């Protein structure tokens, strides 16, 4: 067996030991929430939604926080934006 395979095997065997505390209790996951989660969670806790924060009330989903449209008569369209495709507000 190569050295790399042997090290991977040892790490896989040690992995279950790393997830338990010394008394056998599982270590809880979660940890520190990301900035996006705390921002969204703070708005949900305060009863504010994105639609209430947008003056137009119209939003477009995208990766990460949503985008507020300028007016309520806008619509969302998937457009190419380097290097990905993104949702944009298209206002007539």
From Swiss-Prot:
Family according to the record: Belongs to the conotoxin N superfamily.
UniProtKB keywords: Cleavage on pair of basic residues, Disulfide bond, Secreted, Signal, Toxin
Intrachain S-S bonds: none
PTM comment, free text: Contains 4 disulfide bonds.
Protein name (database record): Conotoxin Mr15.2
GO molecular function terms noted in the UniProt entry: toxin activity
Tissue expression: Expressed by the venom duct.
UniProt remark on domains: The cysteine framework is XV (C-C-CC-C-C-C-C).
Domain of life: Eukaryota
Compartments, record wording: Secreted
Propeptide feature ranges: 21-53
Signal peptide extent: 1-20
Residue numbers spanned by region Disordered: 30-49
One GO CC term on file: extracellular region
